[in-house]
Amino acid sequence: KHTKLGLDACNDDCCQRYQGISNISKSSIKAARNTRGKILMYKNTICDTRYSKSCGGRTEKGDNVWEIDYKPYLESTSDSDYNDETNLSDEQSFEKWLTEQSLSFCGPKFIEEKNLSKYLGNVDEKGKYHRWEVCYSNDELIKIIFDKTGKQFSKISKIVPKKRGASGRILHLDVLGKKINGKEFSLSIKSEYEIRKIAGIAISLTVPHLFNKFCW
């Protein structure tokens, strides 16, 4: 992947932050040896497998996250041993689920936050990893949207999730506010991929009431 740099893998997100052979565990070696030479197939075609080093409690359908065709094997599923059938596309159900104690594999009941450095290494910032908050001022969010879309707000009054996927991640988002001339203005973003590309943040969290800042 990084042949021009003389590397097989880097320690950043594009290679899932490879941390070198000094951090290889016995379980990782065992898993690699047990699956050597094996590939996942679906209808005589190699599967388009995806990986993430973290989870929010539930995965999203592949075609909602990436610009790919629908894959029957990339459906939404629970990130835990507990088969949670909660309908997270419903706004109230999602907010309740988000504030409850998570049973997912990367939640604090499975991995205590004090032990995170063992798994994250020295690359990631210390702090909340499974449930966390990011805040932007009105001006900061206006600049982010302008830089990514060229759409100019003078003020953003509200962010409205119009549709959520099976994981609760927003698939359709409306940004409401005013233009510089004072007229009402709105921006509609109609895919989870586009929302991430524009906002540059994880958007699988509740959009709050506005108190001079937007927090996720």
Sequence positions of predicted segments:
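Conserved, single-site charged/polar hotspot
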Residues: 1-216
